[in-house]
A protein has these predicted regions:
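Active-site beta->alpha loop and helix N-cap motifs at the rims of alpha/beta catalytic domains
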Residues: 2-154, 299-300
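Buried hydrophobic positions in well-ordered alpha/beta secondary-structure cores of metabolic enzymes
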Residues: 22, 38, 70, 99, ...
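Generic structural signal for well-ordered, non-membrane alpha-helical segments
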Residues: 24-27, 31, 63, 123-126, ...
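A general structural signal for well-ordered alpha-helical segments in protein cores
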Residues: 31, 67, 92, 184, ...
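Structured C-terminal cap/extension of enzyme domains
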Residues: 40, 213-333
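Alpha-helical structural signal in soluble globular domains
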Residues: 41, 65, 69-73, 98, ...
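Short helix-coil transition/hinge motifs at the ends and kinks of transmembrane helices
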Residues: 116-124, 197-199, 267-271
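Catalytic alpha/beta core domains of metabolic enzymes, predominantly
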Residues: 135, 147-266
């Protein structure tokens, strides 16, 4: 696939499903059913190695298994992306080679946590980390991070540009900017400048679902986020509408989804990145797309009150929950 992997459209970061609240065993059939739903919606790729997929909480054997299942379900229709989540460079390289050999078509690359100590002065650390991975693994990857992120994902536009130029197989960037459209513009500008210098295409993706219309109108290429596990059809519809120039339709869909978007982003009860992935799973569970919403520890479930808020928000957004709100038990694992 190499440099021909064009990063655009809707790329869901797919959650895993467990057989019960112990979270000790993957529910492979339920996972396949979720993938089949997503593949019916004209998505552009399946990202199975991201944080929304709890990659950092899975064994390597489990990570390879979800890649294999995704490849079986995708049947070549869309690429399957594994994930690189490692603090040591040698570990990142090893993860890449193992997943590559298992069939991953590309990767979502998460920065090491050491970058969080000082993103301004740690630029060379990140670039060396990524470049060594790039040269050893020789596979396309999408980088993750942005200027308004927290912790290790805070990456400045000048670093985005430099990495995009120096890492040959970097083909896309998942930009995290919260609600800051100006920050997205800065990243987009930096990456487009890198495109001109290198002659390669770099897909610029919004990390969230709250300003999807705005970021695509600005020149972005789509979205990569865990929210698409419950709203992939709507996200694809928004993307296509903007690309066709039907901005009225795109905003109508985005505005209709505002209640559940706000509920998941914690607008009603306190913004918190920590619970985004659990809320994505709860939304998918309420809508019947997965049979259970459990996540492995240290993640704790959202409260019953939050589940009630989310169910109400789904209804207000024109969606049809098939389950009642209830308390979610804490995982055993």
């Amino acid at each position: 696939m190499g440099k021909n992997f064009k990063v655009e459209g809707v790329l869901p970061s797919v959650c895993v499903v467990y057989k019960d609240k112990s979270c000790r065993e993957l529910d492979e059939e339920a996972y396949r059913e979720l993938l089949r739903y997503l593949l019916q919606t004209d998505i552009s790729a399946l990202v199975v190695g991201g944080h929304a997929g709890e990659a950092e909480c899975l064994s390597m054997e489990e990570r390879l298994r979800v890649i294999k299942i995704a490849k079986e379900e995708a049947k070549g229709k869309v690429p399957v992306l594994g994930g690189i989540i490692a603090d040591a460079t040698w570990m990142a390289i090893e993860q890449g080679k193992i997943q590559r050999d298992a069939g991953a078509d590309a990767f979502l690359f998460c920065p090491p946590t050491i970058i969080a100590w000082d993103p301004n002065t740690a630029e060379n650390l990140l670039i060396e980390h990524v470049k060594r991975f790039d040269k050893q693994v020789k596979m396309p990857f999408i980088m993750f991070g942005g200027p308004t992120s927290e912790g290790s994902y805070q990456i400045l536009p000048k670093t985005l540009k430099r990495l995009a130029i120096e890492a040959e197989n970097l083909v896309g960037w998942k930009i995290t900017t919260r609600y800051d459209l100006g920050a997205f513009r800065g990243c987009l500008r930096a990456l487009r400048e890198a495109e001109k210098q290198t002659g390669k295409q770099i897909g610029v993706l919004n990390a969230g679902d709250h300003i999807l219309v705005e970021t695509i109108r600005e020149g972005g290429d789509g979205t990569l986020n865990g929210g698409s596990i419950y709203r992939a059809a709507e996200d694809v519809e928004i993307y296509k509408a903007v690309k066709k120039g039907d901005i009225v339709k795109a905003y109508a869909i985005q505005d209709k989804l505002r209640p559940i978007t706000d509920a998941i982003r914690g607008v009603l009860y306190g913004y918190s990145h920590t619970y985004f992935h659990y809320r994505y799973k709860v939304a998918a569970w309420l809508l019947g797309k997965i049979p259970r919403p459990y996540m492995r520890l240290p993640m704790l479930p959202v409260s019953k009150e939050e589940v009630e808020v989310m169910r109400d928000a789904l209804i207000k957004s024109g969606m049809k929950p098939v389950r009642e709100a209830q308390a979610i038990e804490v995982s055993d694992m």
